[in-house]
Amino acid sequence: MTTPTTRKDLMIVNMGPQHPSMHGVLRLIVTLDGEDVVDCEPILGYLHRGMEKIAENRTIIQYLPYVTRWDYLATMFTEAITINGPEQLGNIQVPKRASYIRVIMLELSRIASHLLWLGPFMADIGAQTPFFYIFRERELIYDLFEAATGMRMMHNYFRIGGVAADLPYGWIDKCLDFCDYFLTGIAEYQKLITRNPIFLERVEGVGIIGGDEALNWGLSGPMLRASGIEWDLRKVDHYESYDEFDWQVQWQREGDSLARYLVRIGEMTESIKIIQQALEGIPGGPYENLEIRRFDRLKDPEWNDFEYRFISKKPSPTFELSKQELYVRVEAPKGELGIFLIGDQSVFPWRWKIRPPGFINLQILPQLVKRMKLADIMTILGSIDIIMGEVDR
């Protein structure tokens, strides 16, 4: 009888691209020494659709329906960045009411994105129950979106100089009711998850990123704020009307998966505070800057003539992008979503470079999982929060 020999060689395992916990079509080639991870190589590109090249052959209004397919769980942010660039290039003023509506929609979208991060993240580490709970609240947000925009997911709601339609009658009261209800929902999650000993065993001290390391890797969003860096573009860049509301930047010092969870839970509470203040203080007035429909076509336009009042309000504006370059960014749920835009005195952008937060946050994954256990890969990957639509573009 021969004695079995122990294996000394390393094992290479494929995770994905159709693995249910991969959050899209991400493929990881993992090198294992028993249960220990020796190396991990992410393979991208399965969801590449040429979004940057498409942008260079479309006007801004034609391109708006495409951008909701980057991060398809937080579509308001991709729309916001797409119209913020041309607005800054053309120095277009946004009415106060439109700015408040945008803030409300952006924060609702942030909550919906964080909820759909929380459920699968908990399922990844073995807790099935929250996965079903989060859909309860998320459906209420989608009901609000549907009432205001007509669409549950790909909203196509933002426009250059405002939004596509005003809030319908009764929407503000319905949204305030949701805010009151959702605060009790967050308290329920805190009770169910935050002090759960099994949950803490799985996430505490797993995937630690220091502050300097986070800056060197170019991380942003909850990944950066969980590492002790108090950096939020809503406070830094003063875009939309965020300066008019009282809210706090959520951050933690530890830099592990638990800290990233706590930052996102805290952000949902702060988003509710912003929404409540915006709903209670929303001013009257127009929801769209109608003057930009003319886009400098006429030197002395007649504001009250028949064509302006009845014809030129709704057609797609042929907005010429002036010959300059610009970088605009917003604080998306996953981090800094930016666009580098080069105009060429044409209706099409000459260059449209997307800076997706998920793509840059994902770069640190191989370093985080080295010398960890195989089961910790799902915890760390889940805590990064990626959507392959924006990673591959």
Swiss-Prot record:
UniProt-listed GO biological process terms: photosynthesis, light reaction
Keyword Transport: yes
Enzyme Commission code(s) on record: 7.1.1.-
Molecular function GO labels: NAD binding; oxidoreductase activity, acting on NAD(P)H, quinone or similar compound as acceptor; quinone binding
Gene3D superfamilies linked: Cytochrome-c3 Hydrogenase, chain B (1.10.645.10)
Catalytic activity line of the entry: a plastoquinone + NADH + (n+1) H(+)(in) = a plastoquinol + NAD(+) + n H(+)(out); a plastoquinone + NADPH + (n+1) H(+)(in) = a plastoquinol + NADP(+) + n H(+)(out)
Membrane topology recorded in Swiss-Prot or TrEMBL: Peripheral membrane protein
Compartments it resides in: Plastid, Chloroplast thylakoid membrane
Cellular component annotations (GO), alphabetically ordered: chloroplast thylakoid membrane
Superkingdom of origin organism: Eukaryota
Pfam assignment, any one: Complex1_49kDa
PROSITE patterns, alphabetized: COMPLEX1_49K
Enzyme class: translocase
Main localization, broad class: plastid
Alphabetic keyword roster: Chloroplast, Membrane, NAD, NADP, Plastid, Plastoquinone, Quinone, Thylakoid, Translocase, Transport
InterPro entries associated with the record: NADH_Q_OxRdtase_suD, NADH_UbQ_OxRdtase_49kDa_CS, NDH1_su_D/H, NiFe-Hase_large
Family listed: Belongs to the complex I 49 kDa subunit family.
Subunit structure: NDH is composed of at least 16 different subunits, 5 of which are encoded in the nucleus.
Record HAMAP family: NDH1_NuoD
General function of this protein: NDH shuttles electrons from NAD(P)H:plastoquinone, via FMN and iron-sulfur (Fe-S) centers, to quinones in the photosynthetic chain and possibly in a chloroplast respiratory chain. The immediate electron acceptor for the enzyme in this species is believed to be plastoquinone. Couples the redox reaction to proton translocation, and thus conserves the redox energy in a proton gradient.
Record's protein name: NAD(P)H-quinone oxidoreductase subunit H, chloroplastic
Organism, as annotated: Atropa belladonna
Organism phylogeny: Eukaryota, Viridiplantae, Streptophyta, Embryophyta, Tracheophyta
